[in-house]
Amino acid sequence: METGVPHRPVLYQEIIQYLAPFSPGRYLDCTAGAGGHSKGILEASAPDGQLVALDLDPDAVALARATLAPFGSRAIVIHASYTESAQVLAEIGWQKVDGIVLDLGVSSMQLDRA
């Protein structure tokens, strides 16, 4: 696993613009990858926005945890598939979210490892 953030999120500005994160919103990034979109959402929803980031790839989870560590308890990174999002949210006690991101394309990080 690389130590830097190996993937620049596609349509980053557009996602932040259209999602329009606010404080104290709650957000779900179903395909966190290295955490780029999640980081932007947390920055835009400061000081009290919260985010759950999911990814099935253990390497991506480690990268997302490192990327989102500065946000402390505002960021929860979980090793899970987006298909488990309802279960994950129920387990942490969230009944609703204010926005969801699913970046369903293949990342350059995945292609580099193939």
Give the predicted meaning of each segment.
Residues 1-114:
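S-adenosyl-L-methionine-dependent methyltransferase catalytic core, i.e., the SAM/SAH-binding region
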